[in-house]
Structures are given as structure tokens and as C-alpha cells.
Amino acid sequence: MLKSTVSNTRIKCCRIDQRRNYLFTALASSALGSFLWSKNNVLASKMENGELHYHDPNLTFNKKLFNGKPPFERRAPDYPGHVPLYNFEKVLMFLGSSMGAFFHPEENKYIVALGESTAITPILQHLRHKMLSDPVGRTILREKPRMTSDSLNLTYLRSLPDNTIGKNYVNWLDKENVSPDTRVPVRYIDNEELAYIYQRYRECHDFYHAITGLPIIIEGEIAVKVFEFANIGIPMSGLGALFAPLRLKPSQRQRLREIYYPWAIKNGLFSKPLINVYWEKILEKDVNEFRQEMGIQQPPDLRNMRKEYFAKKKLEKQLQGRK
């Protein structure tokens, strides 16, 4: 009887201990869960309120590398229509346009892109210095005139005497079927003033043709480019003189080598800077007087030389056929 009572007492004590252990475990789990949950809530609240800052070890490096800007973000343009390019983009444009200009010289888009990709800043700065050193050049940079059919008033130029610069210019335009309105705006040259200097060079190109009498056929273009390069120093003109003749016939290369290259180099080097000519203000001037003042001699008529050459070849074939 006594043993049975003791045994029952032990069983009850064990059950009480188990209940206590279970209760303590439940309380401990609840307390721990409440602590963790509370901590997570605090972290979540800080994140939501922007109070929690995560330190990114790459952040400092990225800021130094990109100066706080996303990679390859194009900077703001320097003037309306300007497209700023990275150096690698300029290299790619030069490579693509040079290949296009060589195989398709009739495509103006390649010539335009090649010209702007090779018009490097030191060359344009040298031209700016040359213009600033001349009273007329300074006036051009200050007034920044643009050449169009309206600004030049082609109708008025056709009414001028035959010996004037304006009449020679408009006659050349009509003969070659070209227009000053075809000169596209500069887009890829940095700095607004340097871009204008290149735009001025581009728009004056037809005047160089007019005062020399050279046509826009490939030989005439090459001769004018050599003349420009010797006088103004634009790199594309030199590249054209170097590579364009590779696609010509032997007879064409011979004419350039023996007649037009010597003329272009001599007259380009020893004449006054063409970049400082304010063409719009001398349209009524005698063209021969202007050539004399500038130190420019006219080359032989290229179209006549070609006609004489083809007539000679035709005669030779006829004589060979009779034999």
C-alpha cells in the first residue's frame, strides 16, 4: 500500500516536470520569436524610410571610374545639331567613311563623314589662329556668314558682268549643275567655333572650283583637294590626293602627275590664305584682279585636255583600222 502511494507520487511529479519543461520551452520559443520578429520589423521599417544604408564596396570605385555618370552617357551638345562622339566612335567613323569614300566617291555622305572625322582639333585651332591674325578673318568669325542660294542671291549674280567673281561663280554652278544649298551642316566636330570654321571651309569649296575653272569630275576634284591641302591644310584633302588616284586610269594619273599636282602644290603653298576671303563681299570684284592679288594662276582647261586626249585616241584607232 505504501509502495503504491510512493509510485503514484513519483508519476505525478514526473508529469509536473514535463509540463514545466514544455511550458518553459514554449515561453522561450515565444520570447525568441518575438525578439527576432521585432528586429525584422525594425529593419524593414528602416529600409522603407531610407534609414538603412548598405555599404557597396564597388561604389567608390565606380564613382571614380565614371565620375558619377553612367558608362557611355553622351555629354551635352556644344551647339544645335552637334553629336558628341567618343574617341572610339570617331575612329570607327573614320575607318568606315574612308572605305566608303574610296569605293564610292560619288556618295557625298562618305565624303562628309571622312572630312569631319579627320578635321582634328589642332588643325582647326591653327586655322582659327590664322583667321584671328587677319582683319578679314576676324570679321568672318565675328559675323559667321552662311552661304545659301538666298544669301548669295544667285539671280543677282547672273546679272553681273562676265569678268566678276560672282558671275564666274554662278556660271560654274550652272555649268556643273550644283547648288550651294547642298552643303550639309557640320555635326561631329566639338566646339561651336571650330565647327563653324570647318563649315566655312566646306561652303567655300565651290568658289575654289570657280576661280580655278576646274570641273567636278574626279580629276578636277582631286586637283582642287591638293590645292586646298597646300593652302588650308585640311587633312581629308591630303588623303584624297594620296588615295583617290589609285582608282584612276593611267592617262588620268599622268595628267595629274605632270600638270595638275605641280600646279596645285605651287599655287596652294604660295597664294594667300583662302580661309580669310570674305567671298560674299567681293562678288562684284574682277576675277582676274582677284587671282593676281591672291597669287593664283589658272590651270589648263581640264575638259579641253580630256577632249583632245579622246580625240587623239580615236584618231589613232582609225589609223590602225586602215592599216
From Swiss-Prot:
Chief localisation class: mitochondrion
Annotated organism of origin: Candida dubliniensis (strain CD36 / ATCC MYA-646 / CBS 7987 / NCPF 3949 / NRRL Y-17841) (Yeast)
HAMAP family tied to this protein: Coq4
Protein name: Ubiquinone biosynthesis protein COQ4, mitochondrial
Bilayer disposition of the protein: Peripheral membrane protein
Binding site for Zn(2+): 205-206, 209, 221
Similarity comment text for this entry: Belongs to the COQ4 family.
Keyword list, A-Z: Lyase, Membrane, Metal-binding, Mitochondrion, Mitochondrion inner membrane, Transit peptide, Ubiquinone biosynthesis, Zinc
Catalytic activity: a 4-hydroxy-3-methoxy-5-(all-trans-polyprenyl)benzoate + H(+) = a 2-methoxy-6-(all-trans-polyprenyl)phenol + CO2
